[in-house]
Amino acid sequence: QQLLDTQFVEAADDIAMHYAVDQDQDVLAAAEQLMGDSWFGRHAYYMAQRHSAANNPTYLYFYERRPASNDETIGASHALELNPLFGGFIPFWPTDARDDELSEQMQLYWRNFAATGDPNGAGLPTWTAFDELNAQELALGHERSYSRPVVRADRYEAMTNQLLRREQALQPVSSD
């Protein structure tokens, strides 16, 4: 609650509705999701909205592949996707065939986008472009990769609305 009150001030209760906690053990998971969404997810979503509104080819992804380690606790953390994207993995963490497949897919998507402005290509699951009317993301997950509606869009929207209200409050008042 302190994190919500500090970061979201007047919108804390509205944001909290998206991170409901039923049991004590859910508190850590909700806090981890809140931090990830507020520090990274909402900003990527906002930038995708602005980028696509300017008619630029826009593709958003959500990395879900957790390390295959018995010791991990926070799931797919920030920047963890950089390992498969660049074809390397964290030493001493177990990997499997899906890690290799995901690494190859990600490299192909990025290479295709750099060459053509479209990440899609032969043999790859379709990555649907993001636009404001059809907010899609590519889920890079455990079993497979697939396009879907942005799963946390309602959370990102609530956070973005709060940020925009703050921004408007800082705008100078016109002397007209």
Predicted regions: what is each one?
Residues 120-148:
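Mature extracytoplasmic/periplasmic domains
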Residues 143-176:
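Tryptophan-rich aromatic "cage" segments
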Residues 58, 106-111, 166-175:
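Short secondary-structure transition/capping segments
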Residues 69-73, 135, 148-150:
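Short, solvent-exposed polar/charged micro-motifs at secondary-structure junctions
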Residues 1-100, 109:
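Substrate-gating cap/lid region and adjacent catalytic-acid/histidine neighborhood
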